């Protein structure tokens, strides 16, 4: 099973040390009581991957690992078979020793939209809420972060992260924990907190904003990326049964409304940094994610609308500070 001892040792002497009052018992209970029916199959694939240490590692312009001399075709095929056992791959892409994992999302494009607007990450302790496979954690490390911690209750994503970590030489600067933010104590210990692609899945979005705030140090920075609609500060879409075929979408505010929500929750220096329509080039079906994707979620005759008739996905990045 997954061993979290390295993470416990890492945080024992820093501002995250109070987390050790609750975290080990939480994760022990998770391993005993909450494992997904396929978890052993997924983790078996991770265990059968080779432990590789790249001679060239680029986390600044992507997540790329190479080795000189290169691994053999047979090794690459074995590695690919194990990684394919962890499909679907949604967040990436990853370039590993000549193998290209072409994920559903071009998460590197989102990173390019976010990065110019945020405070430098060098030396920072970071929390990424809803981190998925951990792609952005590695990009944060590429920007010089001291420690990047991701939380996501989806257990396949944890196994994907551990697979990538193993192929990057067992790097201990990034960690993923199988938790939701509601399971975290109020740590007030992270310099930057990211919540990207999460808010619209929350039944109580203001509670989510308070939960994010409670993880930040004083003067810490929130990076919030989420679906929005066009409109003024009073505009909020509450979809019916589904939005873009997703059942669990509750509130999609306009960017000005979201700014007002953040200010209502006590954040300051709130700014709308970026807005971008999601395209079928950024989110699409691939060889590593073979089920339906954005093209099937949009009106086939009018890509400005979802199949349900709502405005097509528009995403905003907002930056805010905890005073």
From Swiss-Prot:
Record-linked CDD domains: AdoMet_MTases
Any one GO biological process: tRNA wobble uridine modification
Database matches in InterPro entries: CmoB, Mo5U34_MeTrfas-like, SAM-dependent_MTases_sf
EC numbers for this chain: 2.5.1.-
UniProt-recorded Gene Ontology molecular function terms: methyltransferase activity; transferase activity, transferring alkyl or aryl (other than methyl) groups
EC top class named in words: transferase
Residues the record lists as binding carboxy-S-adenosyl-L-methionine: 91, 105, 110, 130, 181-182, 196, 200, 315
Transmembrane segments: none
Keywords: Transferase, tRNA processing
Record's catalysed reaction(s): carboxy-S-adenosyl-L-methionine + 5-hydroxyuridine(34) in tRNA = 5-carboxymethoxyuridine(34) in tRNA + S-adenosyl-L-homocysteine + H(+)
HAMAP family tied to this protein: tRNA_carboxymethyltr_CmoB (MF_01590)
Function: Catalyzes carboxymethyl transfer from carboxy-S-adenosyl-L-methionine (Cx-SAM) to 5-hydroxyuridine (ho5U) to form 5-carboxymethoxyuridine (cmo5U) at position 34 in tRNAs.
Subunit structure: Homotetramer.
Family designation: Belongs to the class I-like SAM-binding methyltransferase superfamily. CmoB family.
Protein known as: tRNA U34 carboxymethyltransferase
Organism: Yersinia pseudotuberculosis serotype O:3 (strain YPIII)
The gene coding this protein: cmoB
